Amino acid sequence: MKNIRNFSIIAHIDHGKSTLSDRLIQHCGGLQAREMEAQVLDSMDIERERGITIKAQSVTLDYKAKDGEIYQLNFIDTPGHVDFSYEVSRSLASCEGALLVVDAGQGVEAQTVANCYTALEMDLEVLPILNKIDLPQADPERVCEEIEHIIGIDATDAVTCSAKTGIGIEDVLETIVKNIPSPAGQIDAPLQALIVDSWFDNYQGVVSLVRVINGEVKKGDKMLVMSTGQVHQIDKVGIFTPKQTDTGVLRAGEVGFIIAGIKEIHGAPVGDTITISKKETANALPGFKKAQPQVYAGIFPISSDDYENFRDALNKLSLNDASLFFEPENSSALGFGFRIGFLGMLHMEIIQERLAREYDLDLITTAPTVNYEIASTNGDVISIDNPADLPAINNIEEIREPIVQANILVPQEYLGNVITLCIEKRGVQKDLIYHGNQVAVTYELPMAEVVMDFFDKLKSTSRGYASLDYHFIRFEAADMVRVDVMINGDRVDALAMITHRANSVARGRLLVDKLKELIHRQMFDIAIQAAIGNNVIARTTVKQLRKNVTAKCYGGDISRKKKLLQKQKDGKKRMKQVGNVEVPQEAFLAVLKLDS
């Protein structure tokens, strides 16, 4: 027990977490040189292509320290992006310490601060590590000051290293051994193990990553999952070195995996407690706060035959991704599909990509919206995440939109651009503090503005230097309206959007113009209108294609031409009554790309 060290690596995006973990694995001989590859822990293709970590991964390494003892290091590589902060908090719950990795060239960024506070709230020992020390622009003294000023932890003994070249890796390992406390827990107590993560393997069933708090778990034990009350026999117990390695037993303080041939997908929910069915523990461990979805979108299979496969795919993904929320939805334009809740736009993109790649599905996605609170005239308060569910205007007392508190760290020279952007997005400034060259700005912004394209715009106005961290604070009444789109007088439910009244005319105008480009011309005029209630705020017409019916009349009588033109006109009129308009897939995505 006293030689076990459990820790996580936390950092902002691109500060070198995954590379540092590669070096630690290499140094401790977890993999042979030929098996080593860059970002060995980023197991999904998407993670490698985008160069981001999405899922937390765990590794157990043996390290022979300078004092001659052999230490067992269990470490968890965590994501850095704001959308995946719940993954970070889950990883931290199974550790006693955390390495706070900061890029020695870039310094402290918003996500570093947010993840570090999460670790400090859980009473973890946080060790600052300055990475990328080999870069010419590295400035360790300035960064140490930033760590002390902005985060408020002592950085005098911060370890400097370069994960890329391998300088200072030994110092990092020694610091871990010296400063991170060993786990507390009794091996002879009844088993208590926390499920940190789980995923579905087509051959083995559910694989659970667990941290054993008390007791020990062996192959062949009968384990009880406390929330479901079901008992399963354990087939395999072991650790990741990053390869799956069977050890037959896990004792208090260790992190490893358990496979018990659980076939139903939600047999071992994340955050649950496992115990042995014969001598069970009296109380379950406190689990994790369920991550609340912030953005909702309707996703529909292009072919209705895929509906069942789509549902299975979502079930399997939601096991691996505890924050995914979904419920069936029916749209008159797109048929049957699901309303899915995500943590942010990046999360939504990743899930769409995983559905397309891993499950081979062709899907249409509607415009994402956030969750609104509606106070109706009869005193009820309902919450809606789909514009189509908004009640009639005369039944609504007020619409409340979610407000987030955004903490932005930005270099002084880009402060003006960032403030202008926040004002455009209807933000209210709450705080502004100078730390050397960095400025910490706090704004309250409507969540709908933040989740759409705020992050991209923030990066482009500050040339990539500003960083953002945000969290929900409250609902606030606002003058929101639903803009409906009508094509030849028929409402298309999948194109409706909720927006602020001040932006509604501009957005309605943009949307109908965009649709005009995307909807193919027919034999009759197509009227595209944007309306609030019965009030049309923008309209455009896709002109008809028409044949020149008088071409074959040469010379002569005007009444003959009139007769042919009248006949064409009557035909078009009949066609318009029965004809229906195909709305192409790109039109549903047009709503996403509206840039107000």
Swiss-Prot record:
CDD domains: EF4_II, EF4_III, LepA, lepA_C. Disulfide bonds: none annotated. Pfam families: EFG_C, GTP_EFTU, GTP_EFTU_D2, LepA_C. GTP binds at D14, H15, G16, K17, S18, T19, N131, K132, I133, D134. GO terms for cellular component: plasma membrane. Its main location: membrane. Gene3D superfamilies: 3.30.70.240, Elongation factor 4, C-terminal domain (3.30.70.2570), Elongation Factor G (Translational Gtpase), domain 3 (3.30.70.870), P-loop containing nucleotide triphosphate hydrolases (3.40.50.300), Translation factors (2.40.30.10). It is found in: Cell inner membrane. Keywords: Cell inner membrane, Cell membrane, GTP-binding, Hydrolase, Membrane, Nucleotide-binding, Protein biosynthesis. GO terms for biological process: positive regulation of translation. It is an enzyme of class 3 (hydrolase). Required for accurate and efficient protein synthesis under certain stress conditions. May act as a fidelity factor of the translation reaction, by catalyzing a one-codon backward translocation of tRNAs on improperly translocated ribosomes. Back-translocation proceeds from a post-translocation (POST) complex to a pre-translocation (PRE) complex, thus giving elongation factor G a second chance to translocate the tRNAs correctly. Binds to ribosomes in a GTP-dependent manner. Belongs to the TRAFAC class translation factor GTPase superfamily. Classic translation factor GTPase family. LepA subfamily. This is Elongation factor 4. The gene is lepA.
